């Protein structure tokens, strides 16, 4: 499955919720009527979706939200299933620990896609070492920083300004002036993404 490169608002409308694929400074809230499906007049939603359909849609929503393709998503689920505790919550913990997501959460990228690009282009370091793998798993206590030669990028400054306005999550500690932040801990399930029903994904993969 290739990575989707089309209109971001269309994906959010398809899932019926904001996937945060576009920067808040270019909000899609006015353009994407989340209760209206893509199409000239939107698809009717009078027919009842099957349990399988609901499970599949939830998986697609989370994959798109975090920018992960099927093969890798399946590996994350298998890793989550091996861990102790709730498999669904474990899955979200794995996704939240991806380097591109942490860069986004720290405000260095205004979207996960922009954060992924920063990582791929070697603009970020982890504990002083250059890492260009978006799926790199960040651990509690790791320090994520913008490389010196990348600190003058306008998009990073704009993203940090936006993050300053909307606030940062409690599990990261960021020094915007230094261009670095600490991943304090993997967030608890009740700290993020209330619009995700991970139990549907567990049910899907357990079929």
From Swiss-Prot:
SMART domains: Ribosomal_S4, S4. One of the primary rRNA binding proteins, it binds directly to 16S rRNA where it nucleates assembly of the body of the 30S subunit. With S5 and S12 plays an important role in translational accuracy. Residues 29-38 have a biased composition (Basic and acidic residues). Belongs to the universal ribosomal protein uS4 family. This is Small ribosomal subunit protein uS4. Residues 97-160 form the S4 RNA-binding domain. Part of the 30S ribosomal subunit. Contacts protein S5. The interaction surface between S4 and S5 is involved in control of translational fidelity. The keyword Calcium does not apply. One of its GO terms (cellular component) is small ribosomal subunit. GO terms for biological process: ribosomal small subunit biogenesis; translation. CDD domains: S4 (cd00165). Gene3D superfamilies: Ribosomal Protein S4 Delta 41, Chain A, domain 1 (1.10.1050.10), RNA-binding S4 domain (3.10.290.10). Residues 42-52 have a biased composition (Polar residues). Keywords: Ribonucleoprotein, Ribosomal protein, RNA-binding, rRNA-binding. GO terms for molecular function: rRNA binding; structural constituent of ribosome. It comes from Polaromonas naphthalenivorans (strain CJ2). Residues 29-54 are annotated as: Disordered. The gene is rpsD. It comes from the Bacteria.
């Amino acid at each position: 499955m290739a990575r989707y490169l089309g209109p971001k608002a269309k994906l959010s409308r398809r899932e019926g919720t904001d996937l945060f694929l576009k920067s808040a400074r270019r909000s899609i809230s006015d353009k994407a009527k989340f209760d209206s499906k893509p199409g000239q007049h939107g698809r009717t939603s009078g027919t009842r979706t099957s349990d399988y359909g609901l499970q599949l849609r939830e998986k697609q929503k989370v994959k798109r939200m975090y920018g992960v393709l099927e093969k890798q998503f399946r590996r994350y689920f298998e890793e989550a299933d091996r861990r102790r505790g709730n498999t669904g919550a474990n899955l979200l913990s794995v996704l939240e620990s991806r380097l591109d997501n942490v860069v986004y959460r720290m405000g260095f990228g205004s979207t996960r896609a922009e954060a992924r690009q920063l990582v791929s282009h070697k603009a970020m370091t982890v504990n002083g070492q250059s890492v260009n793998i978006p799926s790199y798993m960040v651990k509690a206590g790791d320090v994520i920083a913008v490389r010196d030669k990348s600190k003058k990028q306008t998009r990073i400054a704009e993203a940090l300004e936006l993050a300053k306005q909307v606030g940062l999550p409690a599990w990261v500690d960021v020094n915007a002036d230094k261009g670095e932040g600490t991943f304090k801990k993997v967030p608890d399930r009740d700290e993020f993404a209330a619009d995700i029903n991970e139990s549907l994904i567990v049910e899907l993969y357990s079929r």
